Every structure is written in structure tokens, then in C-alpha cells.
């Protein structure tokens, strides 16, 4: 059964059409990624779902208009707010369930920092705290807007792993936007923004050079190198890992 329904969504900004008759259906508990270039409308799309912008069309979550439940839709951005409160103080504003707080802090490796002021946290820890706060609010929908741009691969993997863990445990519905191909690995499905539309795309089609090139998507170095080596017939199509690539080149 569809949980998020978007029908004939259109939006313009200063007479410039950003989206035209977009239709999407997302199931409860799905983690979807929206992949496209910068300045393509990813952030605008999430702001529309959050109910922060006026639009033409219909957006419902759990059969309710977003104007009714927008306070129960969590939008995570790269912007981090710092207060003089400690991590524990921040979380106690959301719930008094100390057992739940303790568990999630341990999962995100923040338990030892519980009495630390949020002003002293790194960007990485601030983002972990924001995700924790979002999860504790038990939202109808979580929107994540390219928050991993300033994180290294280890930090990204840690956060993605925890988000996926709680998505599966709590049946969370998540929409994530990114320009990086490597960031979609935890997704249940992937969409592309192109020509004012948002379209579901298969993994097979996604990894074609044309789609990547047309949408100015940042690809992992492995795939970029693979395409160049294939161009000179140095490796075959079925190479999928670095070790296989090295073996074929050395033959």
C-alpha cells in the first residue's frame, strides 16, 4: 500500500518551472534516494514535501494532506544548530525515556559525550545528534537533504548503517537526496530528477554512462576508471571489484 502519494505536482519559482506534473508513490518503510546534479531541485522537492512552499497538485502522507501533518515530517539538512544545552538536555526535551535515549546514543557512539555541550560538537557528531532527535520524535516521514557532503567515507558509512538499522527496526519511511552515486547503496529504490520530472530508475539503467553524464552525477573513482579501461579494451564488462580489474590488466 502506498504511504506517500504525490500527484501532478508542479512548482515554479520566479516564473521558472522547476517541476511539472510529478507523480510518485512510496510505500511505508521504504528508503528511497533521489539522485541528481546540484541546482536540479532536490532541496526544493524536500521543502515541498515538508509543506514549506506553495505548489500545485497533491501531496499526502498516510492519507493526510501535508498541511495537517507537516510538524510530524522531519527535515534534516546540512545546517546544524548549536545551543548551550548538553546532548542529554536536548534529548530530554523530546522524550523522558532514558532507556531509549541510552540505547540510541550508544548505537550512534555518542553515549560518552552525553554531558557535552552541543556547541562543542563536531559537524559529524552534530549530524548524528540531529538524526537521533529526528528518530526519537517518531516522525511520519524523514527527509534527508544531502547532509553527508562534509563527511569522510568512514563517517558516511557509520551514519548510513545506523539510519538503515532504525529504518528496518521502526519501519521508518525515508527520502534522501544526493549527487553522489556511492550514497545510494542503502536505498530500496532510486529516482532521478531530469527535465522537471522525477523518475524511478533501475540499478541496471542507473550505471549506464549516458544517465550518469546527462545528470552530472558524481561517480566513484572505480566506475570512472572502469569506463576508461573498457574504452581501450583493457578489461571486460563483467569486472565488478578492484581486484578483478587489477587481475585483468596484469594478464
Where are these regions (language model features)?
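Conserved structural motif at the start of ABC-family nucleotide-binding domains
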Residues: 4, 18-21
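Conserved beta-strand-loop-alpha-helix hinge in the C-terminal portion
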Residues: 197-222
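The feature captures the beta-strand-to-loop junction immediately N-terminal to the Walker
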Residues: 35-37
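Helix-to-loop junction immediately C-terminal to a conserved catalytic motif
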Residues: 50
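Conserved ABC nucleotide-binding domain
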Residues: 104-121
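Conserved ABC transporter NBD signature motif
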Residues: 57-70
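Conserved catalytic motifs of ABC-family nucleotide-binding domains
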Residues: 74, 79-89, 93, 117
Amino acid at each position: 500500500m502506498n504511504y506517500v502519494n504525490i500527484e501532478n505536482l508542479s512548482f515554479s519559482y520566479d516564473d521558472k518551472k522547476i517541476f511539472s506534473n510529478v507523480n510518485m508513490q512510496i510505500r511505508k518503510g521504504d528508503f528511497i534516494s533521489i539522485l541528481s546534479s546540484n541546482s536540479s531541485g532536490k532541496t526544493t522537492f524536500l521543502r515541498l514535501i515538508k509543506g514549506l512552499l506553495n505548489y500545485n497538485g497533491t501531496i499526502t502522507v498516510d492519507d493526510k494532506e501535508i498541511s495537517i501533518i507537516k510538524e510530524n515530517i522531519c527535515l534534516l539538512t546540512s545546517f546544524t544548530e548549536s545551543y548551550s544545552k548538553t546532548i542529554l538536555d536536548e534529548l530530554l526535551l523530546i522524550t523522558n525515556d532514558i532507556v531509549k535515549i541510552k540505547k540510541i546514543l550508544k548505537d550512534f557512539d555518542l553515549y560518552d559525550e552525553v554531558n557535552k555541550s552541543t556547541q562543542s560538537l563536531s559537524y559529524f557528531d552534530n549530524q548524528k545528534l540531529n538524526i537521533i532527535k529526528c528518530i526519537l520524535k517518531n516522525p511520519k516521514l524523514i527527509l534527508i537533504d544531502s547532509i553527508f557532503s562534509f563527511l569522510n567515507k568512514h563517517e558516511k558509512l557509520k551514519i548510513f548503517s545506523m539510519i538503515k538499522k532504525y529504518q528496518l527496526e521502526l519501519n521508518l519511511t525515508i527520502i534522501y537526496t544526493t549527487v553522489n552515486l556511492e550514497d545510494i547503496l542503502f536505498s530500496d529504490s532510486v529516482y532521478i530528477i531530469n527535465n522537471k520530472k522525477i523518475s524511478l530508475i533501475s540499478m541496471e539503467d542507473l550505471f549506464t554512462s549516458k544517465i550518469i553524464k546527462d545528470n552530472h552525477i558524481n561517480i566513484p573513482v572505480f566506475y570512472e576508471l572502469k569506463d576508461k579501461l573498457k574504452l581501450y579494451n583493457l578489461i571486460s564488462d563483467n569486472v565488478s571489484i578492484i581486484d578483478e580489474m587489477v587481475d585483468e590488466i596484469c594478464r
